[in-house]
C-alpha cells in the first residue's frame, strides 16, 4: 500500500499556502490555485511544511489523504514552475497555428479544426508541427493536450496523427496477400 500522505510537502521560497477551513489557496509567482479538501482529511501547516493525515483510520480516508497530498503538491509545483505538454503532428499537410486564444489545426479532414483554449492554459506553436501547452494547473494542461490529441490520435500503420512528445507508437505491419 502506498504511503504518499506520510511524506510532507515543502513550500519553496516565493510560494504561499493559506488554509481557510477546508479550502487550500496556493499563491506563487505564476498565479494562484484553490482546492477544497474532503472533510475526512486533516491538513496542518508549520512554517513552510504541510502535512496530511486521515481523520480516522478508514481505508477511504487514508486514500483521500494521499490523493490530497499529491494534488496540493501539484498545485505548489504549478504556481512555482508550471507544467507543459508537447504535442507533435505527424502526417502530410498536418499543421497547427495559433490565432489569439484559438488553436487552428489542419489534420487531414475536409475542414480545419478550431480549438479554443480554456482560461489558465496557453499554447505556443514552436513550429507548424509542434504544439507546446503550458499552464499552472496540471489537470487542465493534461486535459487540453488529451483533447487536442483526440482530434486525430496516432494510427498504428503509418504513425500519422497527433502524439505526445514522449509517446511511442507501436507500429503494425500491413496485411499481405
From Swiss-Prot:
Annotated keywords: Ribonucleoprotein, Ribosomal protein, RNA-binding, rRNA-binding
Top-level lineage group: Bacteria
Gene3D superfamilies, alphabetized: Ribosomal protein L6, alpha-beta domain (3.90.930.12)
Keyword field contains tRNA processing: no
Coiled-coil segments on the chain, per record: none
Alphabetical list of SUPFAM superfamilies matching this protein: Ribosomal protein L6
GO biological process, one term: cytoplasmic translation
GO-annotated cellular components: cytosolic large ribosomal subunit
Record keyword GTP-binding present: no
One Pfam family named in its UniProt record: Ribosomal_L6
A molecular-function term among this protein's GO annotations: rRNA binding
PROSITE patterns per record: RIBOSOMAL_L6_1
Oligomer and partners: Part of the 50S ribosomal subunit.
Primary role: This protein binds to the 23S rRNA, and is important in its secondary structure. It is located near the subunit interface in the base of the L7/L12 stalk, and near the tRNA binding site of the peptidyltransferase center.
Family in the record: Belongs to the universal ribosomal protein uL6 family.
Protein name: Large ribosomal subunit protein uL6
Species of the source: Marinomonas sp. (strain MWYL1)
This protein's encoding gene: rplF
Amino acid at each position: 500500500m502506498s504511503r504518499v500522505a506520510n511524506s510532507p510537502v515543502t513550500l519553496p521560497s516565493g510560494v504561499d499556502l493559506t488554509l481557510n477551513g477546508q479550502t487550500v489557496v496556493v499563491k506563487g509567482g505564476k498565479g494562484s490555485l484553490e482546492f477544497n479538501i474532503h472533510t475526512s482529511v486533516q491538513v496542518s501547516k508549520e512554517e513552510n511544511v504541510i502535512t496530511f493525515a486521515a481523520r480516522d483510520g478508514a481505508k477511504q480516508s487514508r486514500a483521500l489523504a494521499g490523493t490530497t497530498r499529491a494534488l496540493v503538491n501539484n498545485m505548489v509545483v504549478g504556481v512555482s514552475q508550471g507544467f507543459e505538454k508537447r504535442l507533435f503532428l505527424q502526417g502530410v499537410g498536418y499543421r497547427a497555428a495559433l490565432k489569439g486564444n484559438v488553436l487552428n489545426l489542419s489534420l487531414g479532414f475536409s475542414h480545419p479544426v478550431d480549438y479554443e483554449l480554456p482560461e489558465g492554459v496557453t499554447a505556443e506553436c514552436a513550429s507548424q508541427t509542434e504544439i507546446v501547452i503550458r499552464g499552472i494547473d496540471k489537470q487542465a494542461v493534461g486535459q487540453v493536450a488529451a483533447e487536442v490529441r483526440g482530434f486525430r490520435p496516432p494510427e498504428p500503420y503509418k504513425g500519422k496523427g497527433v502524439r505526445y512528445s514522449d509517446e511511442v507508437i507501436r507500429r503494425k505491419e500491413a496485411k499481405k496477400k
